[in-house]
Swiss-Prot record:
This is Large ribosomal subunit protein eL24. PANTHER family: 60S RIBOSOMAL PROTEIN L24, RIBOSOMAL PROTEIN L24. One of its GO terms (molecular function) is mRNA binding. One of its GO terms (biological process) is cytoplasmic translation. It is found in: Cytoplasm. Residues 117-135 have a biased composition (Basic and acidic residues).
Length: 162
């Protein structure tokens, strides 16, 4: 049979079922205290870190060394090794890393210029297409100039204040 033990919010002691004092604050936060001493100290706003019998004090002042030693585990370190990235071999990457910054900057500038030209070209094509469409609409006699009838009054509950 397993007993569900809880911890005292002040002292850090184990509280077994049927024991302890439960305090529910006005903001619905639940506190469970081991005994009236813990409850009294909590309501008097004493800090558990300053009382030498609480778990918080013992932890801060490194009194439970045997419990802390069990937690320390060696972290496995990964050995670094070089591997190629998909789409580029290790030689290509090393070659790019070795080239001078001026060459790299020039290549970047050329690529940016090419991208800007492509964007400008697509914009010009869109403008030309739009101009053609507007020209054809005007020549058809103002097909798009038909006025719509005004909408009637809105019906239904708006749900506003009354």
């Amino acid at each position: 049979m397993v007993l569900k033990t809880e911890l005292c919010r002040f002292s850090g002691q184990k509280i077994y079922p049927g024991k302890g004092i439960r305090f529910i604050r006005s903001d619905s936060q639940v506190f469970l205290f081991a005994n009236s001493k813990c409850k009294r100290y909590f309501h008097n706003r004493l800090k558990p870190a300053k009382l030498c019998w609480t778990a918080m004090y013992r932890k801060q002042h490194k009194k439970d060394i045997h419990a802390e030693a069990a937690k320390k585990r060696r972290r496995t370190t990964k050995k670094p090794y070089s591997r190629s990235i998909v789409g580029a071999t290790l030689e290509v990457i090393q070659k790019k890393r070795a080239e001078k910054p001026e060459v790299r900057d020039a290549a970047r500038e050329a690529a940016l210029r090419e991208i800007k030209e492509r964007i400008k070209k697509t914009k010009d094509e869109k403008k030309a297409k739009k101009a053609e469409v507007t020209k054809s609409q005007k020549s058809q006699g103002g097909k798009g100039a038909v006025q719509k009838g005004s909408k009637g009054p809105k019906l239904g509950g708006g749900g506003g204040k009354r």
